[in-house]
Every structure is written in structure tokens, then in C-alpha cells.
Amino acid sequence: MSKRSIEVNEEQDRVVSAKTESHSVPAIPASEEQDAPKNDLEEQLSDEFDSDGEIIEIDGDDEINDEDDLRKKQEEAETLVQKDQSEGNKEKIQELYLPHMSRPLGPDEVLEADPTVYEMLHNVNMPWPCLTLDVIPDTLGSERRNYPQSILLTTATQSSRKKENELMVLALSNLAKTLLKDDNEGEDDEEDDEDDVDPVIENENIPLRDTTNRLKVSPFAISNQEVLTATMSENGDVYIYNLAPQSKAFSTPGYQIPKSAKRPIHTVKNHGNVEGYGLDWSPLIKTGALLSGDCSGQIYFTQRHTSRWVTDKQPFTVSNNKSIEDIQWSRTESTVFATAGCDGYIRIWDTRSKKHKPAISVKASNTDVNVISWSDKIGYLLASGDDNGTWGVWDLRQFTPSNADAVQPVAQYDFHKGAITSIAFNPLDESIVAVGSEDNTVTLWDLSVEADDEEIKQQAAETKELQEIPPQLLFVHWQKEVKDVKWHKQIPGCLVSTGTDGLNVWKTISV
């Protein structure tokens, strides 16, 4: 807090100073200083004289000859104190931001992350916004909990000029733990060997002709020693790259990436000029099996036979030709996959079907179903998110032709106030779900929490804000216009998300 002094000149220069933390205190005229009875104001002044605070200084040009001038000077001093204190208080005020309750931010307002709730939080500025990203599996091992961390990932830009778009492979290293230490915490923490290192970002880029709507990395990148990455372009083409040379360049000094590595190894042109968003690699077919769905309701199946890629000429089709917004392969059945449609339907398909039609169609929403996620741990659970900000979890054992019209989600939440843009089950914890939304947040949910839990009830009774929050909500992360969210399977609890303000790499204390 700044310090100023109050200076009063009468027959001779006299200085009466006061320090105050939360009150403005007028000076006492020198002539009255001896005889004035101690009133409440003086008692307050006496109590606070030794505390830290502000000293208001007013320099008189001339002698103050009457009480009116003195009173005017005192009022000016008091106004300055109050103004300074008011501005200081504004800077210190911290409010809890809840997307379903809080007002929109003003033009001069920003949200700041609370560092005490993050174990790790790093922001990566990008040359252009990125609509999609994926984590590249590495050989550094699983269950990595010590710091600093290293991450390989790939993303693609949305440039204002098409020819400036790029497919980017990023190596992020020296990602230190950012959780603030407690004062009582020892300095020799074995888990935090190098807390003060600076993060390092390396990148290898591949030029693109158009914006990439969606990209996916094959889950067999380590075992097959190739990083198969599919991208779905807004021009309708689906490109398959092998990003192994780019990944190798980060760990092999002097390695020269072949020119051929900057070109796709295969291009799916069956979609014509129709763009799309549905894209997924099979987690069970190691040789490579890719599904791609477009905005005209057509889904193409591409497989690798020996060294040659083949796309089935006959697509799987939706009868109403509505857009395929997302695709997910089953984690347990190699021929089964699910799609999300802009007509509000979740459909279950089988690649063995000669009719190339869905086996089951369930009305999941009255608006677009934007994204779906198949649980890695529980093969019959599927999560979905729609354009209204509602997301839910479905038990696929209830998806039968005779019951299709009566199926209801086993859990459903309307916490978000913007379209759901990404959803993902935690691959290491079957009860945790990450949800990204256009309301500028990524939320983490624990489906194992029961609403009638006594501890939850007590917390809600003590805190008004908690009464409006679903008990399953674990965490709210702020990021501008979130587009995609991915879990890192080898670093428990770590997420990577992309928005219009760049990439975030983060891990909370909640997961």
C-alpha cells in the first residue's frame, strides 16, 4: 500500500501523521491538539497508529488561516484515502466463476487460474488457433508421476490464409510441477527434482493446403514403430501420415527428416469435396483400420492390406443424409462402431453388415449430438455431448431394436451453457470424464460420487454456491472457446486441451 503524509501549516509548520489500514483519518488542528477531548475518532487513531497503512500527504502552498480551508484539505485527504483503498480492494477481490451462474466477463475482466489446485499447468501459444489435437504415444514408460514431464503431441492450425496451415508435431519437455508448495513442506521433495527448469518446446511442421477439422493418432504407434496419423480436411480429403520421422528427430541429434515424410502415405478421396468431422482408428486392428464420416451422412472404411491401403467403395450411410459429427470404435468388438449425428441420434453399426445401415438408432437429443466417447475400461458405457450443452452417459446393454425408443441415459447433466465440443472418458479411471464446451470451460466429473453422500450434503449446506453444483463435478478449468480435449494415457490425470488462446497442458489435484 502506498504511503502519503498529511502536512498542516499554521503559525509554524507542524506535521500530524496517521497510518490506517481500513479507515481514513482527518488530521487534528495543531491548536486543538492539546485540549481536544479524546473522541471515538482519536481512540481509533490511537489504536491504529502503529499499524501499517497509508500516509496521506498534502503540501500547503500557503498558511491555512481558517477552519474552512483546513476542513477542505481534510476532505481531500479523506477522498484520496478512500479512492486508493477502493482500488486496492478491487484488485484483491477473487470470485468463484461458475459457467451456469456467473455473468459473462466484461471487456476488461480476465479469469486467473488458482495455482493451488493445479499440480501442473502450462500454456502454449500457437501461431494460429487449432481445432483438434491428439497425444502421440512415446517410449518413456507408463504411470509417469515424477517431474519434469515430457509430452509428444500433434495438432493442426486454422490459419486465416489456407496456404499457411500446418500439421504440427510438438515435443514439450521440462514440464515442471507448478503446484505451490506449503510453507511447512520440505525443500527436498523426491518427486520434484527439478522444479525450477524452463519448459522446452520443439516442433516439426508439415505444410497443409486447408484447415484440418479433426485428427487422430493410431493407438499402436509404439508397438508398430510408426505414428499413423489421420487428418480430415475441410476440402473433404482424409490424409494418412506417418509421423515417426518427426518424432525421431526430437530424440536423435543430427537426424534429417526425409522429404517423403512430409507427404501423406495415403489419401482417401471418396468423400469428394464434402468435409467432415467423424474420424477414428480401431483400437483392436493393429494393421490399421480407419473410419471417416462426412457432413452428407456417409462413412467410409479404410484398411491396410499388407502395404496397401484400401477404402471400401460402398459407404455406410444415414438414410436422411444428416451429418456425421463423431465416430468411435468399440473397445471390445473389432467390427462395431458408434456415430453421433446432427439429427440427434446415436447409431450403432457393424462393419460386417452387407446393407451398410445402422443396427440400432437411439434418439439421444433434440439437437445435434456433437461428440461421443467409448469407455476404455467399461465396454458398455458411451458418453455423448450435444449442442445445448447437455452431456450424458449411456448403457449400451439397453440399446436393442425393441427398446430403441425408450432408452434413457444412466446419467445426464446440463451444467454447461455452451455446446459440448469434446468429451473423453479417462482411460485409466472408468468413473472420470472430461467435457469441453464453448462456454470456455473444461470440466472433470466423477460418476462414482453419489448425490446422497452425507459429506456432500454437509458441504452443500455450508456453502451456498455448492447447492447449485452437481456433486459429481470435480473441477472446472478455464480456456477460451475449447475445441478438443485429450487425456495422456501414460501420465495419470494429465490432459491436453486446445482453444482459440492456444494449448493447455494441465493436471489437477482432483484426479
Swiss-Prot record:
Organism of origin is Saccharomyces cerevisiae (strain ATCC 204508 / S288c)
UniProt xrefs under InterPro entries: Glutamate-rich_WD_repeat, Histone-bd_RBBP4-like_N, WD40/YVTN_repeat-like_dom_sf, WD40_repeat_CS, WD40_repeat_dom_sf, WD40_rpt
Q: Where is the stretch described as Disordered?
A: 1-67, 181-206
An example GO biological process term is: rRNA processing
Q: Which keywords does this Swiss-Prot/TrEMBL entry list?
A: Nucleus, Phosphoprotein, Repeat, Ribosome biogenesis, rRNA processing, WD repeat
Q: Where is the composition biased (Acidic residues)?
A: 42-67, 184-201
**WD repeat ranges per the UniProt record:** 319-359, 364-404, 415-455, 477-510
User: Mind telling me which Pfam families this protein's record contains?
Assistant: CAF1C_H4-bd, WD40
Q: Which residues carry this modification: Phosphoserine?
A: S5
Name the chain's protein.
Ribosome assembly protein RRB1
Where is this protein localized, as stated in its record? Nucleus
State what this protein does: Involved in regulation of L3 expression and stability and plays a role in early 60S ribosomal subunit assembly. May be required for proper assembly of pre-ribosomal particles during early ribosome biogenesis, presumably by targeting L3 onto the 35S precursor rRNA.
Query: According to its record, what are the GO cellular component terms?
Result: nucleolus
Query: Which Gene3D superfamilies would you find in this protein's record?
Result: YVTN repeat-like/Quinoprotein amine dehydrogenase
Where does the chain cross the membrane? none
| Subunit-level organization | Associates with ribosomal protein L3.
Top-rank taxon: Eukaryota
Q: Which spans does this entry mark as compositional bias, Basic and acidic residues?
A: 1-22
Q: Which GO terms describe its molecular function?
A: unfolded protein binding
Which gene is transcribed and translated to give this protein? RRB1
